[in-house]
């Protein structure tokens, strides 16, 4: 799987690139694992915009993804590798020996027909889910839990992989793709391997209309607005922002200001902050 480039047949294809779908083995999802979801278009319950630049986009069916991997000791065979419009990685359909079907994130290199399993006694092989205490140091992992049994929260994007670097006491030390090094309880589980579709970050959108297909509306710069609309607005011609530092439309510092809460509970678990 790679990136497909286009010739400049039209201005819209000049810089366009898309992911190849050669790894996908099925076009329609498993109906029992899909559901519809109301799209809020960035509005709250009163219809007021609370998240700008959202709206439109193609209709989507949501897939139920198993982030918990809580079917312990029951082998499952990979039936298909499918496209998911709600994330940039692929998903794999698992057929368990007891007859149940579930979707999981597709690890890079996992093939149709292979067998995977979850649990503390699972072998150390691609796609298996184990507690962090059972995983050797230096192993690449993804879909990492933050609280035991809660389901994977960390390293779920396409191409993501974290590394287990140390074990001490009740915690293990994990290096995340962002460069952050943090502690995680050793009872938490993770999946062996790297998330698939590693070239997703190299895709070029190419034209404005493709952003609209994804449900993203135009982002207008504050400096070209009127003073009533943005603190950067106004002036004669191409005027500077007129402030010592850039701010948001509501006057808060922007572009470089750290937004993480100072008293967040997980600060004590972070050894080195992200780059």
From Swiss-Prot:
SUPFAM superfamilies: Nucleic acid-binding proteins, Translation proteins SH3-like domain. InterPro entries: NA-bd_OB-fold, Rib_uL2_dom2, Ribosomal_uL2, Ribosomal_uL2_bac/org-type, Ribosomal_uL2_C, Ribosomal_uL2_CS, Ribosomal_uL2_dom3, Ribosomal_uL2_RNA-bd_dom. Its main location: plastid. GO terms for biological process: mitochondrial translation. Residues 51-60 have a biased composition (Basic residues). Keywords: Chloroplast, Plastid, Ribonucleoprotein, Ribosomal protein. Disulfide bonds: none annotated. GO terms for molecular function: rRNA binding; structural constituent of ribosome; transferase activity. Pfam families: Ribosomal_L2, Ribosomal_L2_C. GO terms for cellular component: chloroplast; mitochondrial large ribosomal subunit. Residues 29-60, 225-252 are annotated as: Disordered. It comes from the Eukaryota. It is found in: Plastid, Chloroplast. Part of the 50S ribosomal subunit. Belongs to the universal ribosomal protein uL2 family. This is Large ribosomal subunit protein uL2c. It comes from Chlorokybus atmophyticus.
């Amino acid at each position: 799987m790679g990136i497909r480039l286009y010739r400049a047949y039209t201005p819209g294809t000049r810089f366009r690139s898309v992911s190849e779908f050669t790894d996908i083995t099925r076009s329609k999802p498993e109906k029992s694992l899909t559901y519809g979801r109301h799209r809020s278009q960035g509005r709250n319950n009163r219809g007021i915009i609370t998240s700008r630049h959202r709206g439109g986009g193609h209709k989507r069916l949501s897939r139920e993804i198993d982030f918990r991997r809580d079917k312990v000791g029951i082998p499952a065979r990979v039936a298909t590798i499918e496209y998911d419009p709600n994330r940039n990685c692929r998903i794999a359909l698992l057929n368990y020996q007891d007859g149940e079907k579930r979707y999981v994130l597709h690890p890079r290199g996992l093939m149709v027909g292979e067998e995977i399993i979850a649990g503390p006694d699972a072998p150390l092989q691609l796609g298996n889910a184990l507690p962090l205490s059972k995983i050797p140091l230096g192993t690449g992992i993804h879909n990492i839990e933050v609280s035991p049994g809660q389901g994977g929260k960390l390293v779920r994007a396409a191409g993501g992989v974290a590394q287990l670097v140390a074990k001490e006491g009740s915690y293990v030390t994990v290096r995340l793709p962002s460069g952050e090094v943090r502690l995680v309880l050793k009872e938490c589980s993770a999946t062996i391997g790297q998330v698939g579709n590693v070239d997703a970050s190299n895709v070029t959108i190419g034209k404005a209309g493709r952003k609209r297909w994804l449900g993203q509306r135009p982002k207008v710069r504050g400096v070209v607005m009127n003073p009533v609309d943005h603190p950067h607005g106004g002036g004669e011609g191409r005027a500077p922002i007129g402030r010592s530092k850039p701010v948001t439309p509501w006057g808060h510092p922007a572009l470089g200001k750290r937004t993480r809460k100072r008293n967040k509970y997980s600060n004590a678990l972070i050894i080195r902050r992200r780059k």
